Amino acid sequence: YSQEEIYHHSAGLNPYRYPDINYYSSEYINKAYNRTDVTAEISGGGGRAHFYSNVSYYNQGDFLKVGEAANNNTSRFNVRGNVDVKLNNYIKAYINANTTFYDSKSGKGNYWEAAATMRPNFPQHAAPLIPTDMIDPNAMAAWELINASGNIITMGGRDYFLAGTQQNKTNVFADMYAAGRSKWTSRQFQFDAGVEFDLQRVLKGLTFKTVYAVDYATSYSTSYDNEYAIYTPTWSKYNGVEYITDLKQEGLDKKSGNQNINGSDADMTMLW
């Protein structure tokens, strides 16, 4: 880096041309996130039968507040129960069951990896998001590109476009705003039932027990996978003020609107 570049990055006079990104600032990360955890238990019974049921639900947000990542969410709903029945002095039976619904939603891009590995001035000479009002009003070719863009981000009353360089056509901020989102879904079910016979009339201490059990689990991922264009700015200074006088587009905006399903898996184990 030249002394001039070092000065401009440290001075912060134009953070959109000379970025100095703090990935851990409150601009991108919440100080806290919400988590809700609710559990209810029901039990009862009499001389011949006893039952127990547990119903639980939790919902958890995320620290991130950028793009689709602001909607990151994990939820889990679980129901578990069992019934024990004494049919008579010689026969007992039981049923246990459990089912779980698990969903995890997330925006594209690995923010924490970027925070740990990316330089604070990445991509060099262009912040990931640049306000459109930094473009010279007379730069008609640049405005034509911006007006045709499918990814103009509005924050705090200003419009931003996705920026980068020819060497860096993607970045984590653009991913979170424009690359789409994904959801991982898991469903689990366990069931077992058994009957126990007391055969002491045949032989003292002799019992017979039969069991049937099912363990079923399925999981899959759904996603909306988008492509996006970034714009490389050319800067000029007029009367001491820096403006963007030209933009070069890298890539294309593509949103099919189709939901993709992948990673589907299902397993079932039966026991008799």
Regions found by a protein language model. Name each.
Residues 1-3, 100-162, 217-248:
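A surface-exposed, glycine/aromatic-enriched loop/edge motif typical of exported proteins
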Residues 1-17, 89-117, 183:
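N-terminal, post-signal-peptide soluble/periplasmic segments
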Residues 1-66:
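Residues embedded in well-ordered regular secondary structure
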Residues 8-18, 24-31, 66, 70-71, ...:
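Extracellular/periplasm-exposed beta-strand and loop segments of Gram-negative cell-envelope proteins
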Residues 30-50, 55-57, 96-98, 157-224, ...:
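Outer-membrane beta-barrel transmembrane strands
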Residues 69-84, 211-216:
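Short secondary-structure subsegments characteristic of cysteine-rich extracellular domains
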Residues 80, 87, 92, 205-209:
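Transmembrane beta-barrel domains of bacterial outer-membrane proteins
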Residues 90-106, 237-272:
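C-terminal low-complexity, acidic/polar tails when present
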